[in-house]
Amino acid sequence: MASAIVYFSRAGSNWVNDGVANIEIGNTKLLSQYIQKQIGCDLFEIKTKKTYTDEYYKATEEAKEELENNFFPELIEYPDLNKYDTIYIGHPIWWSTFPMAVAEFLRKSNLSGKTIIPFCTHEGSGVANSASDMKKYVPNGNIADYFEIRGYKCQNIEGDTKTQDNINQWLDRNKHSN
């Protein structure tokens, strides 16, 4: 069996370190691409049919409304994960958990019996509620401990050996098969 990475990310206006800045590539996407280079597995992006606004504060309000209303945005596609036994799932932290797009992916995917290796990007909240929420959506999965990283560190991941070392140590603790 093999491993795959499934991630959700958002570029544009984002909270970066201590303020709002425009980023060309989302933090979680950069982290997912780095992990893919290290372990050589397939990579799938979770994309919603709706487009989130580019403006940071408005986007956070959209995310809050989705969470409060238990609204699951429709996804463009759902990857077929049958041939994978290990799934790395990456996402930003929005309102103390993963975005509802990730929740939609989790509830529509059969991840029962698979090893789930979650990771997230954030700007200070850490994993927050996402570990317990992941268990709700994947009750029959073998869920590893989360890896969490400040999102702004992903913007220079290729030039930051300390960040690379932290990621690589986490990957070593979560051996996978390709």
What name fits each language-model region?
Residues 43-49, 86, 127-137, 155-166:
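Noncatalytic linker/hinge segments flanking ATPase motor cores
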